[in-house]
Amino acid sequence: MSRVCQVSGKRVQTGNNVSHANNRTRRRFLPNLHERRFWVASENRWVKLRVSAHALRTIDKNGIDAVLKELRARGEKV
């Protein structure tokens, strides 16, 4: 399973670890992903999404119905 948020599209980023001596080694910054179930009252079912903490705030703000509508408009299977 890829480390990509289904709602916000956040994905793994790359960068460097930097030591005190300024030595640089490559590293990955992982998104804060959670697999969550959301109750969709209009469809009378649970929907399971892999979302970032940022996307959870978006869902709280806009509602799960609006977020699912946007996902389906993008062509994502939900």
From Swiss-Prot:
Protein's UniProt keywords contain Cell inner membrane: no
A GO cellular component annotation in the UniProt record: cytosolic large ribosomal subunit
Gene3D superfamilies the UniProt entry points to: Ribosomal protein L28/L24
Molecular functions (GO terms): structural constituent of ribosome
Keyword Transmembrane helix: no
Biological process, per Gene Ontology: translation
Entry-linked Pfam families: Ribosomal_L28 (PF00830)
Stretch list, region Disordered: 1-23
Entries under InterPro entries matching the protein: Ribosomal_bL28 (IPR026569), Ribosomal_bL28/bL31-like_sf (IPR034704), Ribosomal_bL28_bact-type (IPR001383), Ribosomal_bL28_sf (IPR037147)
PANTHER family: 39S RIBOSOMAL PROTEIN L28, MITOCHONDRIAL, LARGE RIBOSOMAL SUBUNIT PROTEIN BL28M
Family of this protein: Belongs to the bacterial ribosomal protein bL28 family.
Name the UniProt record assigns to this protein: Large ribosomal subunit protein bL28
